[in-house]
Amino acid sequence: MIIKLSIEKGLSECTDFNKVLMFIQPLKLKLIETKTLEYLYSLISKKFKIKKSFLLYTEDGYAIPPSEEGSILKEIDKTFKVLKLNKVKKNEKTDDSGDDLMETDSDNKNKSSESDSSESDSSESESDSSESESESESNETSENESSSSSEPESSLAKKKLLIQQLKRDFQLKEKLQQEQQKQKEAQKPKEKPQQQQQQQQQQQQQQQQQQQQQQQQQQQQQQQKQKQKQQKQQIEQQHKKPPQQQQQQQQQQQQQQQQQQQQQQQQEEVPIGIDDVLTNFSYTISYDNIDELLVEEEKIKRKELEQKKRKLQSQLDNDGLANKNDNNSNNNNYNNSNNNDSNNNNTNKPLSKRQKKLLKKQQNSSQIKENYTINAINNKNDNSTNDSNNNNDNNNNNKNDTNDSNNDDNNNDKKKNNNYSTFKDLTIPNVNDKIAFQKHILLDYVLTVSEYLEGRIEKIDSDILYIRLEPGFDDFEFLDNEFFEESGALGVPVKSLISPKLISDNN
């Protein structure tokens, strides 16, 4: 049976396997570093599922054993031939065994029928097979000698060489197999005690793991029991609370409700200011309009302060001293009550930006009223000469107050209008650095007026700076309250700072 095989598609399947003979062109045998003949033998045995020994031959009839050094296979012809060999029975002649290797398919089919009968004797020992092979080879030599008259001498010489090579190859294979069996038998007793030790170690490890798991389960159960006990104790303690604690809780709840109501009232009373307009509609306002709003806001504030002072002075001049005392006392009590309420609110919760502004305005107005009432009482008890002096003193005090306020405004204006371009740009912020940054950092737009705030860095948390603002720079009209911490520091991301400057302590 002749089988044509393709290396690309893989070796074709066969149903009946004996010793395989393969013809390879001698031109395809070249030296290479990777693919050896051993690799080719193993590939054929795996693909054809051949467990018995076989040999490869060239077209000239030379055997190529796998152990031969120097003959290394680079590539095989895509259409090489594989022939099935017939085993030789004992004491039988094989006249056509060597000659029929290159014959037609019909001769090979006849030989395949003979190979079926020879498979029954394949289970004999290696010694018997070697004897039979030697006898068959001797028979083949005798037959070849008898047929030498018809064939040329060159073919006889080739056959003799083939027979000699076959003998050598089979002898080498038998020796290799015997050595491999000896090595396996020598390794078996050594492997057994090692396997026993490994099994014992594995059993010990499994036992240890089981013990650890049991201990963990016990610990978990104990922890769960302790938690349940603690929960029961807490529930019992809550039910057994004394009446004093209950009263305190009720009082605290009432105070919280009152504070919430007061905050709601204050928020309702406070009118909508420029801060709300800018924060809510900052994306629709142009730069020029914002500048005008800033200037107008400062003018309005100054006018309101002057009007309040004039009204207070006119009230003191026109009203009677008795009515002034009564009104002042009532106003003082009212202001004190408001101050107490506001202080309570401040202690409980941090004030918002608007509440701070209202408290400052109320405190300033109450202080001015108290000063005028005290002066009026002193004027009533003193003589007319003292009255005139007191009036002069009051006028001087009022002038001083206005001058002080004007001086404060001028100082603030100087600070705001400081030439910050002379300072260095802030590149790497550090704790305790004194810095200046633009006032409008928390809004979505950029002002053309270069207004700055000054402060000192208290803490740096990743990319957020916590800045303590310097006194005189506490005008938070363009800052969002959410960025202020409870400590009063301003938490600002570094990336949101616009043109920050590093101020040296000498300035």
Curated annotation (Swiss-Prot):
Designated name of the protein: Putative uncharacterized protein DDB_G0274435
Protein species of origin: Dictyostelium discoideum (Social amoeba)
Compositional bias of kind Low complexity: 144-155, 194-236, 243-255, 313-350, 378-409
Bias kind Basic and acidic residues: ranges: 174-193
Annotated segments matching region Disordered: 91-162, 174-255, 309-422
Comp. bias intervals (Acidic residues): 116-143
Comp. bias regions, Basic residues: 351-360
